[in-house]
Amino acid sequence: LDYVYGPGRRAMNSPAVPALTKVLLEDVKKALTNTLSPGDRLLLVDMDEWGVDVALTGSQKALSFPTGMGLVCASPRVFFDWKDYLRTYWHYDQALDLELAVEAWGLSNRYNLSLGLGLNKVAGGKVFRDVGYPVK
């Protein structure tokens, strides 16, 4: 929620929002004002008290995060029913493997540090001599 401007503030002022939630969010805002940057948001959800069955969260752009960057919280009632849901679900987009993305980034950037230091300084030149690379 946007605590200061826009829909977050209007929602907090709405009579539909329980008074306890307003107090909780105001306390969180006061406690974290100096900790969070202007774009950071924190929302505490008591899933049991609010009757929430499934909650999704993700880094940066909410549901536009890459695979592996999301968190799904499920109540016990829903958690044990996943098998019925998974049989009828298919991903609408090509699934990405975050591990492969990180590995690809590492492979493309692995020599940047060593080349910046100079070939002679990396491992004392021993690694390069062992593979037949001329080292002075």
From Swiss-Prot:
Lineage: Eukaryota, Viridiplantae, Streptophyta, Embryophyta, Tracheophyta
Induction field: By light.
Record-given protein name: Serine--glyoxylate aminotransferase
Reaction(s) catalysed (UniProt annotation): glyoxylate + L-serine = 3-hydroxypyruvate + glycine; glyoxylate + L-alanine = glycine + pyruvate
Family the UniProt entry places it in: Belongs to the class-V pyridoxal-phosphate-dependent aminotransferase family.
Disulfide bonds listed in the record: none
Entry comment describing in which tissues the protein is expressed: Expressed in leaves but not in root tissue or seedlings.
PROSITE patterns tied to this protein: AA_TRANSFER_CLASS_5 (PS00595)
MF terms (GO), sorted A to Z: alanine-glyoxylate transaminase activity; L-serine-glyoxylate transaminase activity
Organism: Zea mays
